[in-house]
């Protein structure tokens, strides 16, 4: 058996290599965390935009069903009352429910004020951002 000193037989990383890796990880974390936060805010805003499209689709479907019914269109209040504005547990309306003229919709940390144009006998109501 060959004789080796204790220092020659030890293997591993040097202190310089460990510090270099920690510095690189710190730089990556400093760059990645703000991007992640921006990504979350952007996703929440896109979810609100999708909700506006969903509300417009529901408004059009409800208006179409009313127009095809025997009674036909009577008033915007009747049309708005028939529209399902519950978008699920992740969305909340300021004040609990929207008004016939609009409301504030919140998803996550993002809120969006919405306006609603009234329906008429010739067109459904439309949701939009100011």
Identify what each model region corresponds to.
Residues 1, 23, 36, 55, ...:
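Conserved short hydrophobic patches within well-ordered secondary structure
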Residues 1-13:
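N-terminal leader/signal peptides at the extreme start of proteins
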Residues 11, 17-20:
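Internal alpha-helical transmembrane segments of multi-pass membrane proteins, especially GPCRs
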Residues 19-35:
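Alpha-helical hydrophobic helix detector
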Residues 35-53:
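Aliphatic-rich helix starts adjacent to a transmembrane/signal segment
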Residues 51-69:
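N-terminal alpha-helical signal peptides/signal-anchor transmembrane segments
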Residues 64-118:
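Extracellular/periplasmic head regions of type IV pilus-like filament subunits
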Residues 118-130:
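Short, low-complexity, Pro/Ser/Thr/Gly-rich segments in the mature regions of secreted, periplasmic
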């Amino acid at each position: 058996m060959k004789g080796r000193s204790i220092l020659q037989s030890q293997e591993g990383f040097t202190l310089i290599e460990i510090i270099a890796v920690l510095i690189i990880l710190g730089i990556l974390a400093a760059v990645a965390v703000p991007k992640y936060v921006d990504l979350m805010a952007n996703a929440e805003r896109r979810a609100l935009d999708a909700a506006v499209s969903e509300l417009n689709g529901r408004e059009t479907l409800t208006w179409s069903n009313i127009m095809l019914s025997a009674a036909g269109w009577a008033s915007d209040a009747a049309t708005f009352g028939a529209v399902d504005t519950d978008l699920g547990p992740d969305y909340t309306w300021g004040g609990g429910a929207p008004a016939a003229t609009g409301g504030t919709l919140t998803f996550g940390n993002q809120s969006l004020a919405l306006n609603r144009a009234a329906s008429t006998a010739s067109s459904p109501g439309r949701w939009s951002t100011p």
